[in-house]
Amino acid sequence: MPKVTVYNQTGSQVGEIELAEAIFGIEPNEAVLFEAVMMQRASLRQGTHKVKTRSEVRGGGRKPWRQKGTGRARQGSIRSPQWRGGGTVFGPTPRSYAYKLPKKVRRLAIKSALATKVVENNIVVLEDLVLNAPKTKDMVAVLKGLTVEKKALIVTADANESVELSARNIPGVTVITADGVNVLDVLHHDKLIMTKAAVEKVEEVLA
């Protein structure tokens, strides 16, 4: 079982915690991580692209000139695809790009992402994270005590408005709850900061 040091909010060591081997101690599967990231990024696409077909562009109800005798190429509508201002053939239409991987693959991807942070020594476990009022400077002080200078993902057991509001204005810092842990967020941030309660909740969900 991987062991990780537990810190308090001031950055002092207060003990150790054993992380679940089946979650934090597995060998990260890069192929599964790739598929999970692609799935999440695909679901983020708006898919609102749209072009007009020949039936939707303005004009073109009348045949521009008679079929024979003009010397020009025969035309049936000024809104055919070959005309300037004509409709587009097989152009993009609104669609959803979202798709889902099998549940077992998604769970393996989350485990692999968490295990990656353990392997890289980029996981920090806090005894607890309590802020009496939403203050950015208090959150900055916590991160400074933990010597976190890069992008950080803070995971709490439950929704905590004071923590969320305190971190909202800090560039590169994101706060999520334990049941919202996902591959893209974990890999996108350099440091993973979890409270002990959040670790226990994640282990309970992924066990």
Curated annotation (Swiss-Prot):
Keywords: Ribonucleoprotein, Ribosomal protein, RNA-binding, rRNA-binding
Cited function: One of the primary rRNA binding proteins, this protein initially binds near the 5'-end of the 23S rRNA. It is important during the early stages of 50S assembly. It makes multiple contacts with different domains of the 23S rRNA in the assembled 50S subunit and ribosome.
Cited SUPFAM superfamilies: Ribosomal protein L4
Keyword Transmembrane: no
Positions of the UniProt region annotated as Disordered: 45-89
Compositionally skewed regions (Basic residues) per UniProt: 60-71
Gene: rplD
Quaternary structure and interacting proteins, as annotated: Part of the 50S ribosomal subunit.
Protein name (Swiss-Prot/TrEMBL): Large ribosomal subunit protein uL4
Record's GO cellular component terms: ribonucleoprotein complex; ribosome
NCBIfam families: rplD_bact
Record bears the keyword Zinc: no
Pfam families listed in its UniProt record: Ribosomal_L4 (PF00573)
GO molecular function: rRNA binding; structural constituent of ribosome
Species assigned in the record: Bacillus mycoides (strain KBAB4)
InterPro entries: Ribosomal_uL4, Ribosomal_uL4-like, Ribosomal_uL4_dom_sf
Family statement: Belongs to the universal ribosomal protein uL4 family.
GO biological process, one term: translation
